[in-house]
């Protein structure tokens, strides 16, 4: 259905007008004043409403589920530092023990080679 509204002007006169959906496109609308008689309509007369809202909600629920899964997979569980930067970064991570695993230079080189492969 097309919503009808009543506007108040500065002179307190009532001026009825309608906002119509032109050509069944949700972004196209027009304002008409005066008496108008609708002779025909085309397109989907049930566009919008509860069905449309439910589709939008379903879409965004799925999108948020996807984002949540991606965030959970990206969580950092352990931080391993190689070199002398441990003391500098420990304050940044609220005193968290950053070196739960010890990596020697030899192990570091082996890991680098595997990563580059």
Swiss-Prot record:
Q: Which family does it belong to?
A: Belongs to the heat shock protein 70 family.
Molecular function terms from GO: ATP binding; ATP-dependent protein folding chaperone
* Key words of the record: ATP-binding, Chaperone, Nucleotide-binding, Stress response
List the Pfam families hit by this protein, alphabetically: HSP70
Q: What is the lineage of its organism?
A: Eukaryota, Metazoa, Chordata, Craniata, Vertebrata
Q: How does it assemble?
A: Interacts with PRKN.
Q: What does this protein do?
A: Molecular chaperone implicated in a wide variety of cellular processes, including protection of the proteome from stress, folding and transport of newly synthesized polypeptides, activation of proteolysis of misfolded proteins and the formation and dissociation of protein complexes. Plays a pivotal role in the protein quality control system, ensuring the correct folding of proteins, the re-folding of misfolded proteins and controlling the targeting of proteins for subsequent degradation. This is achieved through cycles of ATP binding, ATP hydrolysis and ADP release, mediated by co-chaperones.
Domain remark in the UniProt entry: The N-terminal nucleotide binding domain (NBD) (also known as the ATPase domain) is responsible for binding and hydrolyzing ATP. The C-terminal substrate-binding domain (SBD) (also known as peptide-binding domain) binds to the client/substrate proteins. The two domains are allosterically coupled so that, when ATP is bound to the NBD, the SBD binds relatively weakly to clients. When ADP is bound in the NBD, a conformational change enhances the affinity of the SBD for client proteins.
- What are the binding positions for ATP in this chain? 72-75, 84-87
Tissue-level expression reads: Detected at higher levels in caput epididymal spermatazoa than in cauda epididymal spermatazoa (at protein level).
Q: Tell me if Protease is a UniProt keyword of this record.
A: no
Q: Which domain of life is it from?
A: Eukaryota
Q: Read off the InterPro entries from this record.
A: ATPase_NBD (IPR043129), Hsp_70_fam (IPR013126)
Coiled coil spans? none
Gene3D superfamilies per UniProt? 3.30.420.40
For this entry, the protein name equals: Heat shock 70 kDa protein 1-like
